[in-house]
């Protein structure tokens, strides 16, 4: 039984890591294909000798009409989701407070900076779509964590 449970956890961890990497790659792809070449990510790809391939891809999608929020806000939400998934996978069997503090760092900083931009306390342009994209991953994670906790609590009580 314990081996079956361990196998289930390992599959879940693998799924979380794969999904986190997919979110990260999708966010990077949006940046590389639809954003300015002056961004650091493009410069890093240039150093790796990937600029010709990326330029070819950029040319092939140049007529795609994607919305502003997909171009500018969605990648950051995908990065936030990737961070949460990968950190949760790394600390899967640990339910200490430090795990949740570490998972909360990126969402708190991103949401906080967006709110501070709105209040004009930090430099930058407030964008409600950024705020939404930063907020959705931690909200989903909180709902998932709460439901898992309640399910495990009910399961233990019924034994």
What are these regions (language model features)?
Residues 1-159:
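Bulky hydrophobic segments
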């Amino acid at each position: 039984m314990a081996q079956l449970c361990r196998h289930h956890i390992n599959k879940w961890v693998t799924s979380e890591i794969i999904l986190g990497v997919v979110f990260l790659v999708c966010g990077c792809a949006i940046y590389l294909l639809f954003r300015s070449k002056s961004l650091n990510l493009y410069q890093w790809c240039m150093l790796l000798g990937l600029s010709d391939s990326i330029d070819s891809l950029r040319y092939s999608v140049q007529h795609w009409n994607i919305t502003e929020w997909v171009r500018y806000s969605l990648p950051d939400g995908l990065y936030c989701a990737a961070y949460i998934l990968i950190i949760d996978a790394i600390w899967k069997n640990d339910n200490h407070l430090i795990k949740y503090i570490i998972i909360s760092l990126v969402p708190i900083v991103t949401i906080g900076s967006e709110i501070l931009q709105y209040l004009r306390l930090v430099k930058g342009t407030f964008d409600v779509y950024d705020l939404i994209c930063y907020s959705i991953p931690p909200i989903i994670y909180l709902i998932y964590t709460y439901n898992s906790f309640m399910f495990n609590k009910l399961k233990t009580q019924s034994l």
